[in-house]
């Protein structure tokens, strides 16, 4: 298997053996074979990526993530699923996709998406709907967009994006705070925390030498 990784601050473009194009967001990892089989095209994603899948009706394309499997023949879509996060989101830009449980013993269909729809999973709860804007792909231009997300989700994302370990000493902060904002990658992690502080009272200590942040 070949491995492609997007380093800090970089959106990495990868062209797969069948001509499929993949853009990896910050800290994302993609595993794929040197050559696809004649029956199916399988890749494994840890992180966020945008896919433009080369059309081949005879050989389906699968994106494996920790909890959910995406099945397509040729389409454009975004998938975000970081290992250990218990969350998943797929946004369909063009074409259609099928979503299945990623279980080695038994795959079960969850739902199908058509153009302009999204599917999300958070701690085992499913949600589908219409995409509200084009901000879903803003990360491809180095912009991070958060729309009423739990504070924990924002912290998990920026910890990955900027390669910091974030420790929260007051768990109530994670339970009560939700965040909305749009940030440039070049703004840096401390700028993001200062902006969030304007709406939610918390203190933080940052250790840039060891890439550690403590929030209380």
For each feature predicted by the language model, list its residue ranges.
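A residue-level detector for the "anchor" residue at the start of short, highly conserved motifs
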Residues: 1-216
